[in-house]
A protein has these predicted regions:
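N-terminal export signals
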Residues: 5-22
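An amphipathic, aromatic/His-enriched active-site/gating alpha helix that lines ligand/cofactor pockets
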Residues: 7-11, 51, 55-63, 81, ...
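Short, well-ordered beta-strand segments in beta-rich or mixed alpha/beta enzyme
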Residues: 27-35, 67-102
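Short acidic-aromatic low-complexity motifs
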Residues: 37-40, 59
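Solvent-exposed, non-transmembrane alpha-helical starts
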Residues: 41-45, 97-100
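A general secondary-structure junction signal
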Residues: 69-71, 125-129
Length: 129
């Protein structure tokens, strides 16, 4: 009887190990290429660091947000007219969308957007691989 129980335990363990593990959800990244008006650059950076970042960091699922200034294109062409890239990382796309729908986001994003030379910016959504 012990042999049967032992074999059943081994078989159950082998089946559990062979079954694909439930993969945890991976974060998403939103990349936005922005054309910031040179005359508004200091204001945009001030708004990003003192208004947008603190508000975003309090949201459920928030991981990180960065504002990157384009230095140079090492291969290929840089996005036309873009001089900054905004990168936002959330634990899930649903949490990012919930943040976008908040009244706080409706107040803080326009502080960035008003400094842009063009509102025709590229928005790319990535899943972490």
């Amino acid at each position: 009887m012990r042999r049967r129980t032992c074999l059943q335990t081994i078989l159950a363990g082998a089946c559990a190990a062979a079954a694909p593990a439930a993969s945890p959800q991976r974060p998403i990244q939103l990349h936005v290429d922005l054309s910031v008006d040179a005359a508004q650059e200091k204001q945009m950076l001030h708004n990003f660091h003192t208004v947008f970042r603190p508000a975003a960091s309090k949201q459920p699922g928030f991981i990180d947000v960065k504002m990157l200034k384009l230095r140079s294109a090492l291969a290929g062409a840089a996005p036309a007219g873009a001089n900054y890239r905004f990168e936002l990382t959330f634990a899930s796309e649903e949490q990012r969308q919930a943040w976008v729908a908040t009244s706080v986001h409706q107040q803080v994003w326009p502080a960035i957007e008003k400094t842009l030379a063009s509102k025709n910016y590229t928005i790319l959504l990535y899943d972490e691989a």
